[in-house]
Amino acid sequence: LPRIDQIINAAAEHDSLCFLDAYSGYHQIKMAESDQAATTFITPYGPFCFNTMPFGLKNAGATYQHMIQTCLEKQISKTVEAYVDDMVIKTRHVETLIDDLRLTFGNLRTYDIKLNPEKCIFGVPSGKLLGFIVSNRGIEANPAKIRALLQLDIPADLKHIQKLAGCMAALSCFISRLGEKALLLYRLLWRTEHFVWTDAAAAGLDEINTLLASNPVLIGPNIGEPMLLYIAATHQVVSAVLVIEREVDGYKFPLQNPVYYVSTVL
């Protein structure tokens, strides 16, 4: 399967987006007659088997991905990105949207792939894709994930800290020097006894919440575009960020835009 981060980067910073949903997903792929018996299941009315690919098969996702990439081969990485049954048509200029749609629909029709119109969205400036928000601004965190973190109660035990750490991990690429800000929180994960929530730990969490509430935005690099790597290291934490410099109208010097943050507690 493709890397999710590559799909997200490629879909961001476009003027218009169309999100497509295939009708019944995997069931649009027919099973080979010789393999149908392997999908047999028992019901009160006797045994039945699938004649189309069911959900749950080990290679179902990869098989569906292969079908979509074959169908949209000439558009993948150009005007279309696809991750299994999540497809997005990306248009740099609104004027070419209809042409991009016409080409995509023609390719889907060639392979008899049907879409669910109730779940398709056309010509929008932003939308949710694979757990992120992509728009012409760049890549933003899913607001639902941010709300989940902001609404967590003050941790009272190890289980609560583990839940908090999980929420932060899902948003880590948006948080500068996360390891330093959350160091005291991570240390609580190592303790099995004498759990104590301190003011210093609360201050670190407040700093993270404030940063996320500001709606940070990442951008995706273009092929061949130079990037800068900044590293900050202490004896406890190593943090880094990939940055791209781009010229912006009205500014004398190029602006630095973050691509991805990483942080590791030693």
Specify the residue positions occupied by each region the protein language model found:
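C-terminal reverse transcriptase regions that engage the nucleic-acid substrate
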Residues: 78, 83, 118-225
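A short acidic-Thr-Gly-centered motif at the start of a beta-strand
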Residues: 3-16, 216-223
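Amphipathic alpha-helical blocks
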Residues: 8-44, 115-117, 160-184, 233-235
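A short, polar/acidic, helix/strand-boundary loop motif
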Residues: 45-63, 248-266
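Hydrophobic (often cysteine-bearing) scaffold residues that line and stabilize catalytic clefts
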Residues: 4, 19, 60-64, 80, ...
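Acidic, metal-ligating active-site segments
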Residues: 234-250
